[in-house]
UniProtKB/Swiss-Prot annotation:
It comes from Pongo abelii (Sumatran orangutan). This is Large ribosomal subunit protein mL44. Component of the mitochondrial ribosome large subunit (39S) which comprises a 16S rRNA and about 50 distinct proteins. The keyword Metal-binding does not apply. One of its GO terms (biological process) is RNA processing.
Amino acid sequence: MASGLVRLLQQGPRCLLAPVAPKLVPPVRGVKRGFRAAFRFQKELERQRLLRCPPPPVRRSEKPNWDYHAEIQAFGHRLQENFSLDLLKTAFVNSCYIKSEEAKRQQLGIEKEAVLLNLKSNQELSEQGTSFSQTCLTQFLEDEYPDLPTEGIKNLVEFLTGEDVVCHVARNLAVEQLTLSEEFPVPPTVLQQTFFAVIGALLQSSGPERTALFIRDFLITQMTGKELFEMWKIINPMGLLVEELKKRNISAPESRLTRQSGGTTALPLYFVGLYCDKKLIAEGPGETVLVAEEEAARVALRKLYGFTENRRPWNYSKPKETLRAEKSITAS
């Protein structure tokens, strides 16, 4: 104790009067900033959980602010088509929905007379829409590609009326949200049937001309960017080419290797040309000579059918006045 006082006196009076330096304390994080960080972390955890286990899809009718009658009316206005509301409502009612609702009523113990729903299935409208769509598409394709054979026209029509194309169009037109079905998401077969029922309702409401334009605008457009043999699957292109040339009184094609590169590498490339009467009619690439020959045959078929990559695009500006829509409706 005494030695400490002696040292303070030796340092002088200024040391006694000097203020004590404050102790440095690490800054404490604010409550607000900590809450924000925790909230962001919680949101990230929730996002990762939804990515791992996404929730099951929910019908739009099970969410708030849903008016089915208003949605039906808005559907026609959105497409700029005049539908009969009764026909349009019928087009969205599937037989599986009627059966499921009647079964639910029976389980609740409701009387048999009250179990039956006053709803009509869209089966008849769907059959009319399917028949008219196939006939109308056949006429469109025959007028646009007169050199395409009947088998090719048939395959293109099957592609445009298939489940993949029709369901893609129906989902983008919000047909799935209005469809009354037992299951959700709506199965592809049910959605396809509903879309053709909508076409059948439009056919009875606005006539064949407006329905033909509807088919042109929403189904023919699905051919954009598609190659012919993506829609028409053929197994033996060379055999088909020989038949087509024979119909035109042209000699059978002769294949020749025109170019090649990297034959000893892992990625070889061969070009095979097809000659008729010493004239090059087509040339195609491939990783083998056989594949290149088949591709050359496909190129030649595209030229014969007028379905080349640089073909004239489909004219959507003016509908044809001589459309055989009356014949379509009578045939359907």
